Amino acid sequence: MFQKVEGIVIRTTDYGETNKIVTIFSRELGKISAMARGAKKPKSRLASVSQLMTHGHFLIQMGSGLGTLQQGEIISTMKEIREDIFLTAYASFIVELTDKATEDKKHNPYLFEMLYQTLHYMCEGVDSEVLSLIYQTKMLPVLGMRPYFDTCAICHQETDFVAFSVREGGFLCSRHAEQDPYRIPVGEAVHKLLRLFFHFDLHRLGNVSVKDSTKKQMRLVLNTYYDEYCGIYLKSRRFLEQLDKFQI
């Protein structure tokens, strides 16, 4: 059976001397993998369409196991991302998180649209670090995680938030922050932005400007929470940390 899908390449794996296994997150079927025979050959008709982060239409011969990519038509190569090391790093984080957080052939058009919109914004010049933070926040419920972003994790009141507790699973107000000695102190902007990112419609994203110190706190909160409850290891996250460390 042949299936035509619209999708974005989220992973490629070399297979033998000339072939690739291409993993695509599609609008119609969710995550699917297919053998792209000869795709490593420069003159192959599948060479360009099987590149990481390529957005296109793909014709796949489906089977009980691994499908076979027959042909593809490029919608966008995400050229702006490929030409910038920082954009490539953040986009790689986003597609790897999508890959690790999803199961094969689980239809999720909302997630496809979020992935497409995030990469599209990145190509348009929206702050790539902020986009990665938004995406990481919005992936929490996909992974079955719902931190307390709206109320204090202990008293469940909407009040002044001064810290984030991984142990309690959310923000803490000034009255209860002392109950977790390992709490992460945060500024008011961190709470407001994480709550906003969790709930808002990504299509409504306008001009966004976030202080570097706020982004750093948000990244610490999200990474620490993911490490505790998710158990996903991302190579791309290590690369991002190295970029930040050496300030390339």
Swiss-Prot record:
GO biological process: DNA recombination; double-strand break repair
Superkingdom of source: Bacteria
InterPro entries: ARFGAP/RecO (IPR037278), DNA_rep/recomb_RecO_N (IPR022572), NA-bd_OB-fold (IPR012340), RecO (IPR003717), RecO_C (IPR042242)
CC per GO annotation: bacterial nucleoid
Pfam families from the UniProt entry: RecO_C, RecO_N
Swiss-Prot/TrEMBL keywords: DNA damage, DNA recombination, DNA repair
Signal peptide: none
Biological role: Involved in DNA repair and RecF pathway recombination.
Annotated family: Belongs to the RecO family.
NCBIfam families per record: reco
The protein's name: DNA repair protein RecO
Source organism of the structure: Bacillus cereus (strain G9842)
Lineage: Bacteria, Bacillati, Bacillota, Bacilli, Bacillales
